[in-house]
């Protein structure tokens, strides 16, 4: 049996009109290898369903996590994931109900620091006479993606008192 768990965004929030990182954890509990496809379905702003497919290969007993990036249309509050075997039989189906920020005047700020509490003052800060507020999302070296699309949910990333040597070359 192959199992799939999925999570999205940073801190369980998503912003429409941007690329959304989706982290998918696979576990192959079968005694044989698994070869198939992960299919991700999203509803785009033009109300058309878009389909993204990614190959999946798992050795017997293997567990692994992959990150995918899909564009998130406006007014889309869910994403469907299906794991298909090599014969295109559906093995697992998941629905991700997205927590879309309903506040259009919110600036998402990623905070990369060895002392994240030192940047708390940036959370819920008001700009332009309070018409624009910030939402601070603490980041760690492990959560910085290797693909720049993984940071598309942020309006800015603030770095303070951080050891750059903890990042990989790809990051």
Segments predicted by a language model, with ranges:
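Non-catalytic, glycine-rich low-complexity segments
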Residues: 1-21
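A short, gly/pro- and small-residue-rich
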Residues: 166-171
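Short, hydrophobic beta-strand segments
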Residues: 54-62, 66-76, 80
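Short edge beta-strand/loop segments characteristic of extracellular beta-sandwich folds
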Residues: 21-29, 69
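Short solvent-exposed strand-capping/beta-turn motif centered on an Asx-Ser/Thr pair
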Residues: 11-13, 27-32
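Short acidic, flexible loop segments centered on an aromatic residue
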Residues: 31-47
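Aromatic-Pro/Gly-enriched surface loop or interdomain linker
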Residues: 76-156, 160-163
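Surface-exposed loop/edge segments in extracytoplasmic proteins
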Residues: 46-54, 65, 90-94
